[in-house]
């Protein structure tokens, strides 16, 4: 039995643009988010309050947050890796934040230069500040179906990290297959383990299409009761670990599949495709959305 409705979390402006080589002008980012707001998407991850030294693409985070037209009923979460980022985000008007963890020790070490345990301790500072400010926090767990450095990751480890982030107060845990290596079988096994520790209503999946498995993996998650799915307009965001490989699943393709299954999303597919066309033209690249590629030929 599929869920009757699915909340689509648009991650293109943050996770998508973050991997773009050339810096995207601030007005283009603002226009992208404003167009996405008009599609009916309920959640649009807007930017990341990380140090510009680490991610130059997101250096304009405050300008973006203050420049976008925030529609009622739409949330605009931002990624905040630490307390400093959290404070800057709140100062810029953020009403929801995300923290980014991983189920791989080596990935955590290379990504934020500490152990998983230490990363969770760092998050507790953000969690406490967020609680005091009544700001909801979403937790990402990366490398849930494999790691670019460690290879296989056990479902038990994913469940353990997810449980810790959930019990710290994250209202939703987004399980991310950053390298897109998972298949429906490994997705099913991993979700079964995590669902023993975290209620399915608090889970989301974040699938990359690097190996062409994203929609199949999402379908399995839906069958298991997951009703929140992350996606990126036009499939923006390559894979940082595999040059030229596709990254995030395209929001257009996800919505097309959900429409076909009769699952309600509230998203206008045509407006979404127009937004994909806009950002691809602005970036001078072709879309990674199969639906948009097909529509171009009609």
UniProtKB/Swiss-Prot annotation:
Q: Give residues where N6-acetyllysine occurs.
A: 21
Q: Where is this motif: Microbody targeting signal?
A: 296-298
- Give the EC class as a word: lyase
Any one annotated GO CC term: peroxisome
Q: List its EC numbers.
A: 4.1.3.4
Task: Identify the metabolic or biological route this protein is part of.
Answer: Metabolic intermediate metabolism; (S)-3-hydroxy-3-methylglutaryl-CoA degradation; acetoacetate from (S)-3-hydroxy-3-methylglutaryl-CoA: step 1/1
- State the Gene Ontology BP annotations: ketone body biosynthetic process; L-leucine catabolic process
- The UniProt record gives the binding positions of a divalent metal cation as 15, 206, 208, 248
Homology family:
Belongs to the HMG-CoA lyase family.
What protein am I looking at? Hydroxymethylglutaryl-CoA lyase, mitochondrial
**Per the UniProt entry, what species is this protein from, by scientific name?**
Gallus gallus (Chicken)
Q: What is the lineage of its organism?
A: Eukaryota, Metazoa, Chordata, Craniata, Vertebrata
């Amino acid at each position: 039995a599929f869920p009757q409705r699915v909340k689509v979390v648009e991650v293109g402006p943050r996770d998508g643009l973050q991997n773009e080589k050339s810096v995207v002008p601030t007005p283009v980012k603002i226009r992208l988010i404003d167009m996405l707001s008009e599609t009916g998407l309920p959640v649009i991850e807007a930017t990341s309050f990380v140090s510009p030294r680490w991610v130059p693409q997101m250096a304009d985070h405050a300008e973006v947050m203050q420049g976008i037209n925030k529609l009622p009923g739409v949330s605009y979460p931002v990624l905040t890796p630490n307390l400093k980022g959290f404070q800057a985000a709140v100062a810029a008007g953020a009403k929801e934040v995300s923290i980014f963890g991983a189920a791989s020790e080596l990935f955590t070490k290379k990504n934020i230069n500490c152990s998983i345990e230490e990363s969770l301790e760092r998050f507790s500072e953000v969690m406490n500040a967020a609680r005091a400010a009544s700001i909801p926090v979403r937790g990402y767990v990366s490398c849930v179906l494999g790691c670019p450095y460690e290879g296989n990751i056990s479902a038990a480890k994913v469940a353990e990290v997810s449980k810790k982030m959930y019990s710290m107060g994250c209202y939703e845990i987004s399980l991310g297959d950053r390298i897109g290596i998972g298949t429906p079988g490994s997705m099913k096994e991993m979700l079964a383990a995590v669902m023993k520790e975290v209620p399915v209503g608090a889970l989301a999946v974040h699938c990359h299409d690097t190996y062409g498995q994203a929609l199949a993996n999402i379908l399995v998650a839906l069958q298991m009761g997951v009703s929140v799915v992350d996606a990126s307009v036009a499939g923006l965001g390559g894979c940082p670990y595999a040059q030229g490989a596709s990254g995030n699943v395209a929001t257009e393709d996800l919505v097309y599949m959900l429409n076909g299954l009769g699952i309600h999303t509230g998203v206008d597919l045509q407006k979404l495709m127009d937004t994909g066309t806009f950002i691809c033209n602005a970036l001078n690249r072709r879309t990674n959305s199969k639906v948009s590629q097909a529509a171009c030929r009609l």
